[in-house]
From Swiss-Prot:
Keywords: Lyase, Mercuric resistance, Mercury
EC id: 4.99.1.2
Origin species: Clostridium butyricum
Name assigned to this protein: Alkylmercury lyase
HAMAP family for this protein: MerB (MF_00714)
Single GO BP term: response to mercury ion
Family stated for the protein in its record: Belongs to the MerB family.
Cystine pairs: none
Length: 218
């Protein structure tokens, strides 16, 4: 399984580098997640200060991201982690946030350095799936049989459309059978294996710590 997980990581990394945000995500994504984890929208100026990048560069990158969620004041409210409700509830320090997909909920605790409580419905049965996840391990999963669906699309120009919208929790492998029938190239992983996949995917953002240490410090 470790070899299979590494193959998925390699495939997704290759597509991500060519897809939405490209290399810019390595310095933008993690600081933005850390700021969004505070439960409030994020200004371009705050992102520039935190990343040490010029305002115009940050603005240009954001304008190139088809999936980023912006409010009427031009502030970021979502990019993977979001203030806008989705089925994937993501609770940090008592703040109710949301994630775009099941795998996001497993990747983000390490990137924001926080313990997270997650609740998401089985994509097939609607049964609630509840997890407590620390940055470096999964504390609990209910039901223990839960799995995560994974796809490896060729085109990641819009990551939410191509990837996130197909990455779900299922209460068991049996509950995922119909989804697998409809997605011949898809896979399902145990939650533990999906967490390991997410951990490896998250390493591409390790260089992107806040530049000045003044915001969302881990």
């Amino acid at each position: 399984m470790k070899t299979e997980i590494q193959e998925i990581v390699t495939r997704l990394d290759q597509q991500s580098n060519k897809g939405e945000g490209g290399e810019s995500m390595k310095w933008l994504f993690r600081p933005l997640l850390q700021m969004l984890a505070g439960g409030e929208s994020v200004t371009i100026e705050d992102m520039a200060t935190t990343t040490g990048k010029p305002v115009e560069e940050v603005k240009k990158v954001l304008q190139s991201l088809p999936s980023v969620e912006i409010d009427e004041q031009g502030r970021v409210v979502g990019l993977g982690l979001t203030l806008i409700p989705t089925p994937h509830h993501f609770t940090v320090d008592g703040k109710q946030l949301y994630a775009w997909c099941a795998l996001d909920t497993l990747i983000f605790p390490a990137l924001i350095g926080r313990s997270v409580n997650i609740e998401s419905p089985c994509h097939s049965t609607g049964e609630p799936i509840r997890l407590n996840v620390e940055p470096d391990h999964i504390v609990s999963v209910e039901p223990s049989t839960a799995v995560v669906s994974i796809v490896t699309p060729d085109d990641m120009s819009s990551i939410r459309t191509a990837f996130c919208n197909e990455v779900h929790f299922f209460s068991s492998p049996n509950a995922a059978e119909d989804w697998l029938d409809q997605h011949p190239g898809g896979k399902v992983l145990s939650v533990e294996d999906a967490f390991e996949l997410g951990r490896l995917m998250g390493t591409r953002y390790e260089e992107s710590r806040p530049a000045n240490g003044s915001c969302c410090h881990i």
